[in-house]
Regions:
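Rhodanese-like catalytic fold shared by cysteine-dependent sulfurtransferases
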Residues: 1-21, 28-77, 88-136
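Short, surface-exposed ligand- or partner-binding patches at beta-edge/loop junctions that are enriched
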Residues: 80-81
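Conserved G/P- and acidic residue-centered "switch" motifs that form tight phosphate/ATP-binding loops
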Residues: 85
Length: 136
């Protein structure tokens, strides 16, 4: 089962738990143009593995193998992040099915839902919470 958590909870866990890791499953284009969580204060780097390929949107068939290739083990607590919590849910489910028991979906995502004017990053999510982020 995948537990939903909020960005602020994840930031606290990344700082407090040596076994905590953040896996950003957005596309390369999103990492470049929208930005990335800046985990320097937690002495970590986000792990970048796309769940879907850009621009086709096809699911990355090598996702689990790439996750294992980062050195992640079942002992790690893995927090999955996407724009607004949908792709990260799918990625976390795949990781759990592959034997990673401590997986979490960052439900509010990096940018969260759109506001009344259709803009993201204002209502909820990593950016809206004021958590550290940077351009790639």
């Amino acid at each position: 089962m995948v537990e939903d958590v909020r960005s602020a909870e994840v930031w606290a866990a990344l700082q407090a738990n040596k076994a905590a890791r953040l896996v950003d499953v957005r596309t390369d284009a999103e990492w470049i143009y929208v930005g990335l969580p800046d985990l320097d204060a937690a002495q970590k780097e986000p792990v970048l593995i796309p769940w879907q390929m850009f621009p086709s949107g096809q699911v990355n068939g090598g996702f689990v193998g790439q996750l294992r290739g980062t050195g992640m083990t079942p002992e790690h607590h893995i927090y999955f992040l996407c724009r607004s919590g949908a792709r990260s849910t799918s990625a976390a489910i795949a990781a759990a099915a592959a034997g990673f028991p401590h997986v979490y979906n960052i439900a509010d995502g990096f940018e969260g839902p759109p506001d009344a004017e259709g803009h993201r990053g204002q209502v909820a999510g990593w950016k809206a919470e004021g958590l550290p982020w940077r351009q790639r």
